Amino acid sequence: MITLRIKDLREDNDLTQAQVAKKLMCDQSLYSKYERGEREIPLRLLIILAEYYNVSLDYLVGRTNKKEFNI
């Protein structure tokens, strides 16, 4: 579920893997492995992505389908 969500969010925001990888301070090849599910994405990077896309961690991990981030 995480892999689909991070890829969909990236594409919905018209971003390349390289752009997101730069935000996460990792190589594009590593980020690509996260999207394909070949590597498990660390929690600290999920937190950065949730803040970047303004979605909840629950959305990223598939616990909810509600994208909105509630403060």
Predicted regions and their residues:
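Short, charged recognition helix plus adjacent turn
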Residues: D12, V61-I71
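DNA major-groove recognition helix of helix-turn-helix
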Residues: E35, Y53, T64
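DNA major-groove recognition helix of helix-turn-helix/homeodomain DNA-binding modules
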Residues: M25, R44-Y59
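Short, basic-rich loop-to-helix N-cap that marks the start of a DNA-contacting helix
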Residues: E38-I48, K67-F69
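A short, Lys/Arg-rich alpha-helix, primarily the initiator
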Residues: M1-D12
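Short alpha-helical DNA-recognition segment
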Residues: L15-K33
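Alpha-helical residues within the helix-turn-helix
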Residues: E11, K22, E51
